[in-house]
Regions:
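OB-fold/S1-family RNA-binding modules
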Residues: 1-26, 30-36, 43-44, 77-236
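Nucleic acid-processing catalytic cores of prokaryotic defense/repair systems
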Residues: 38-40, 51
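A short macromolecule-binding patch
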Residues: 54-68
Length: 236
C-alpha cells in the first residue's frame, strides 16, 4: 500500500512489465439505478445522480438508445427524472465527476455479459480461433440471449473441452446475477447502488490466460482471501 492506495505490479522474468496504483474506495464498475438530473443538449451530455449528492457525467455521443429504464416511458430517450440502469466507467478526477454509461457489463474469467448486444460474440483478438468458436456455439445453444448478450473472452482460446462446464456455469451465474440486479431495481428507489464490482486487482488477475500466472504474492490477508474467493479451487 502507498498512502492508502493499493499497488499492483506484474512481473515477467523478474522484470516489471505492468504497474497500477488503485484506489480502495473507487466506484469503477459499480452498477446503479441512476436518476437523470438534467440533459444539457448544448454540451451534448446528461448528468445522472447515482447516490445522494453524487452526480455523474453521461456523454450523449455514446448514447445508443438501448437503455434499461425503471420508470414508465413512451420513448427511448433520456429525460430529466428518468430512472435508468448505469455503470461507472471512469472515476472522478479532481473537479471532474465520474463518467457513466448505459452499456452495462459483467466481466468473468471466460465471458463478458453485456446489456448492449444480443447473441454471443467473440473477442476481436480471437475471432478465428477454433476453441473460441466452440465456446460460442456452446453458449448459443445453452443460454437465452434475448435481453442481453455475451462476449467470449480471449482466455477461451487456451481452454479444453473439459473446461466447458465451468464456462457454462460462469455464464449462467452471470445471467442470474444480472436478472437479480434488474429485479432489485423494481423495488429500490433511484438513485441506488445495485451491484458493487469486484476489486480491480481481481479483474486484472482473471484477465490473464490460464497458464500465464505462476505466482501471486500479497502482504495483505484481506486481499489474499478475496483473490481465493474468485479463483477456481484448482488454481489457488
Amino acid at each position: 500500500h502507498i498512502d492508502g492506495r493499493l499497488v499492483s505490479a506484474e512481473y515477467d522474468n523478474n522484470i516489471c512489465v505492468g504497474l497500477d496504483i488503485l484506489s480502495p474506495t473507487g466506484v469503477m464498475g459499480n452498477i446503479y439505478a441512476g436518476r437523470v438530473e438534467n440533459v444539457v443538449k448544448n454540451i451534448n451530455c446528461a448528468f445522472v445522480e447515482i447516490e445522494k449528492g453524487v452526480k455523474c457525467y453521461f456523454p450523449l455521443e455514446a448514447d445508443n438508445n438501448r437503455h434499461i429504464f425503471f420508470n414508465n416511458k413512451n420513448n427511448d430517450k433520456l429525460n430529466q427524472g428518468d430512472s435508468v440502469l448505469v455503470q461507472v466507467i471512469k472515476e472522478a478526477v479532481k473537479t471532474k465527476p465520474p463518467t457513466v454509461t448505459t452499456k452495462v457489463s459483467l466481466t468473468g474469467k471466460y465471458v463478458v455479459l453485456s446489456s448492449d448486444i444480443r447473441g454471443v460474440n467473440i473477442s476481436s483478438k480471437t475471432k478465428k480461433d477454433e476453441m473460441s468458436k466452440k465456446v460460442q456455439s456452446l453458449l448459443l445453444e445453452s443460454l437465452n440471449t434475448e435481453k442481453f448478450g455475451f462476449i467470449v473472452r480471449t482466455n477461451c482460446k487456451d481452454v479444453n473441452e473439459s473446461d466447458f462446464e465451468d464456462i457454462l456455469k460462469e455464464a449462467h451465474d452471470m445471467s442470474q446475477k444480472f436478472e437479480n440486479i434488474l429485479q432489485r431495481a423494481t423495488y429500490e428507489k433511484a438513485p441506488v447502488c445495485l451491484y458493487k464490482e469486484k476489486p480491480l486487482y481481481v479483474n486484472h488477475i482473471l484477465g490473464f490466460p490460464n497458464d500465464y500466472i505462476d505466482e501471486i504474492i500479497t502482504d495483505d490477508d484481506n486481499i489474499y482471501d478475496t483473490i481465493c474467493a474468485y479463483l477456481p479451487e484448482n488454481e489457488r
